C-alpha cells in the first residue's frame, strides 16, 4: 500500500518566482503542484491552503493548519506543509505544542524561488515527502526538513538571510539526516505538554535589551491591552536596573513576563544577584524560559494563556 501524504501549501519563496528584474514575487500557480513525484510508494494529495508570504502568517493561520490536520489525519499517513522560511519556525513550534495526531508532520520551504539558479525548493519538498512517509518520524514531534537535515520544531531557527543551510539547531544540532537511500535519526524528541485550542488571541510583544536601555520601552506599552511580555535579556538573563524596576509595575498588575537570552547559544538562568540581574528578576516573578528563542517563547506564553493557565501552573509550564 502506498503512503498517502497530505500536502498543505501556504505560500512563501518555495511557491514564488523571480521576475525579469530579479525581484521575487508571489504566483497564483504554485510550482510545487507541477513537480512530478519520482518517489515510489508515496501518493500525494496537495491543497493550496494559503498563498501568503510568511511575514503575513498570523496565529489564526497556524490554528487553521492545526484544525485541518486534525480533520484530515485519519485519511493520511503523514502531512507536509510548505511554508515561507521567515516564520516557518514559529508555525512549526505552534503545531508542536498542539495535540496533533500521531502521524509525521513535516514543514519545509526554500531559500531560492523556483526559477532562480540553484533553486532548493523541489529538493526540499521531495525530502519532506520522504520523511513524512517514514513511520519513525511520527514519534519525533513536528519536524522541519531543509537541506538534507531534519530538525525538531522546538529548537530549530533561521540563522542566515539567504543561505540554503539557514535552518540550524543551536546547542543541540539536528535530529537526523536525509541520505540518498535512507533516513538516519540519531535523537528523539522529549515528551511535552500539548494543548487543543479552538481559538488564539492576545498581545504578547517582545522587547530586546540593549546597552543604555532605561524604562522608555516599557512606558510605551499600553498595559490595558497587554496580555504578557517577552524580554530578550543579556547573557544568562540580565537587564539594566531601570528596566527591571519598571517591570515590577507589570508584574504587580498580574501581567506575566518571560525572559530568554539574546545569545545565539546557551540557556537563560538566574546567576547574577545585582540590580537587574537574573536572581533579582526571578525573585520578582519573571519566568526564565529554557532552550527557546524569543519568538518561540512568545508563542509558548500566548498558547499557555489561551489554554487558561495561571499562577503556579503557568510558572511550571513556562519554566519547564
Regions found by a protein language model. Name each.
Residues 74-88, 224-236:
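Short acidic, glycine-rich surface-loop motifs adjacent to enzyme active sites
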Residues 8-10, 81-83, 106-109, 143-147, ...:
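Short beta-strand segments
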Residues 84-103, 239-248:
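Short Gly/Thr/Asp-enriched flexible loops that form oxyanion-binding sites at enzyme active sites
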Residues 241-320:
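ATP/nucleoside-binding phosphotransfer catalytic cores, i.e., glycine-rich phosphate-binding loops
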Residues 21-29, 93-105, 121-127, 158-164, ...:
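A glycine- and small-aliphatic-rich helix-loop capping segment at beta-alpha/alpha-beta transitions
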